[in-house]
Amino acid sequence: QYIMFNRTLTTILGIICLLTISLSDDKFSSFRELKKISNGMSIIHASDSKVGIIAIHGFYPAYWVGIHHEWVQPFNYLVENDINTFFYKYDWNDCPSSVAVDFNKELNDLINKYPNINQWQVVGHSMGGTVVLFSVLNSELNERIIYNTVATALHMDIGKVPMTTRMSIEKRFEKCPDNLNSFNEAFSKGFKNKLVQWRNVKEFDSQFKKYDFDPYDKEIKNSIVVQFPDSLNGERVGHTSSLYFAILEIVN
């Protein structure tokens, strides 16, 4: 199922969100507060809500300063709207397939700990979405869980990646034989659980715009694809900002 993004709905949601945030104090003022959180599953906010959001971050290069900055605005919005929010942190130098094994254990423990939550939304951003794909690949059917990938590549043609990043990707793929290019059979069959892909226009995605191929251009049977436009409310929808727009839609 392929869905073109609804600009009108997001405009309304954006206005609501701006009003909400302007009337209250943010829980997180900086990415530095998120950076201090230990690896593993952590509670960002607990409430009586029947919905639980589980966030999974992506990869950060060694030179990256604002680690987890992309989650500050989404987390503040979720807290203000009193939605159960959890953050799964991990060593992004580990293989996503290995990370997913630990995540699935943490996810099962979390579901058992919060039986009153009847809908779980797992949201992986960028390489966090790769963790989501390995997670859903090895998950039993659970209709209470919806898996989301945001700004996540679905395949990698290393020969068409700019030289500036090619070497690091080659090293990761050599280290991790189970990688993005291992999903061909799984994608053709589809997954047991519901999967929603939130895709950007490749040319407006800072992570992928210089690639000589479209890493989003891969079909996953029975998944839902939400295609973002190049901009919303005058703001470019890029690799980072698409996460916030996706969260707005997921919880509304």
Give each language-model segment a name:
Residues 67-68, 157-163, 206-212:
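Short aromatic-enriched loop/helix-cap "lid" or pocket-rim segments at secondary-structure transitions
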Residues 25-118:
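Active-site catalytic motif of lipid deacylating hydrolases and related acyltransferases
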Residues 61, 100-192:
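Serine-dependent carboxylesterase/thioesterase catalytic core
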Residues 59-60, 91, 151-154, 201-203:
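Catalytic metal-binding/acid-base residues of hydrolase active sites
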Residues 1-25:
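Classical Sec-dependent N-terminal signal peptides that target proteins to the secretory pathway
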Residues 77-86, 142-145, 219-224:
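Structural alpha-beta junctions
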Residues 54, 86, 148, 196-199:
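Hydrophobic/aromatic beta-strand patches that form the interior of the parallel beta-sheet core
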Residues 170-174, 178-252:
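C-terminal catalytic-base region of ester-bond hydrolases, centering on the histidine
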